[in-house]
Amino acid sequence: MQNRNFNNLIIKWAIRLISIMIIINTIFWSSISEAFPIYAQQGYENPREATGRIVCANCHLAKKPVDIEVPQSVLPNTVFEAVVKIPYDMQIKQVLANGKKGSLNVGAVLILPEGFELAPSDRIPPEMKEKIGNLFFQPYSNDKKNILVIGPVPGKKYSEMVFPILSPDPATNKEAHFLKYPIYVGGNRGRGQIYPDGSKSNNTVYNASITGKVSKIFRKEKGGYEITIDDISDGHKVVDISAAGPELIISEGELVKVDQPLTNNPNVGGFGQGDAEVVLQDPLRIQGLLLFFGSVILAQIFLVLKKKQFEKVQLAEMNF
C-alpha cells in the first residue's frame, strides 16, 4: 500500500514537472519564433525575392544601413571572411514584447552564390575563430546551404559579425566556374513591426480605425490601452486596442481621423540590405600572370644591360 502511494506521488510530481517544462518551452520558443530571422525561414522558401528585395523588410519597416566586406578575389577551396556590419546607436533602448525597454538584438542573412557555403570548423583558422566569437551560423534550409542566417544576438557585442565562408572548387564541383559572383546581405537591428500573419507587434504605431471622438481611454492592467471612439457619422462606438509599449499621443474628448496615429512610434531599429562582389580566381591564371610579369621584368633587365654594353662599345670606339 505504501509502495502504491509512493508510486502515485512520483507520477504526480513527474506530471507536474513535465507540465512546467512544456510551459517554459512554449514561452521560450514563442519568444524565439517572434525573432528574426526564423520568421523568414518558416514563411519563405527563398529569402530574396525576384525583385532583389530581401523578405525581412516585410516585417522590419524602417530602413537602416548595413555594410558587407569581402575579399576582391578568392582561390578555390579556401576559407575567407565576409564581414557584416550593422551599425546603430548603442545607447538607445527598444520596446520589448512585455512593453518594457531593453537592449537591441541584431540578425543577418547572407546570400552566397551557389557552391559557396559555411566553412567547416576544422577549416577555420584560429585567428578567424577569435573574430567569430560565440556566433552560431546555420543554413537557411537543407537544400540552401549557400544562404546563412544568424540571430537574434546581442547588438552591443555583435554589431559586426564575421562569417567564415568556404569557396567552391570547379575541379570537383562542375556547377562552379571561375567568374565574378554577387553576394547579398540583409541585416536588422531591433524587433519588427509586423508579424508574418499581418498582425502588429507592440513595436509600432497604432492608428484610429474610424473618424470620430475619443470618448474613453482605459489603461489595461498589463499595459496598453483600450481607446473608445464614437463614430462621427452615426455615433456607434469602436474600441481600438494598443499593446503595451507605445505611448498615447491623444486624450479623451479629442477628435481623430481614420488612420490618425493614436500612439507614438517606439521603433528605434530597422532593416537594410547590401551587396558585394567576389571573383573566384583560377590559380593557373595567377601563375600565368606572374610569369608574364616576370618575363616583362627580365626583358627590362636585359634591355638595360644591353644598353650599357652598347654604351661601353661606343665609348671604346671613341677612345680608339
From Swiss-Prot:
Its cofactor is heme. The 4 large subunits of the cytochrome b6-f complex are cytochrome b6, subunit IV (17 kDa polypeptide, petD), cytochrome f and the Rieske protein, while the 4 small subunits are PetG, PetL, PetM and PetN. The complex functions as a dimer. Heme binds at residues 36, 56, 59-60. Belongs to the cytochrome f family. Its main location: plastid. The keyword GTP-binding does not apply. Residues 1-35 form the signal peptide. It is found in: Plastid, Chloroplast thylakoid membrane. One of its GO terms (cellular component) is chloroplast thylakoid membrane. This is Cytochrome f. It comes from the Eukaryota. The chain crosses the membrane at residues 286-305. One of its GO terms (biological process) is photosynthesis.
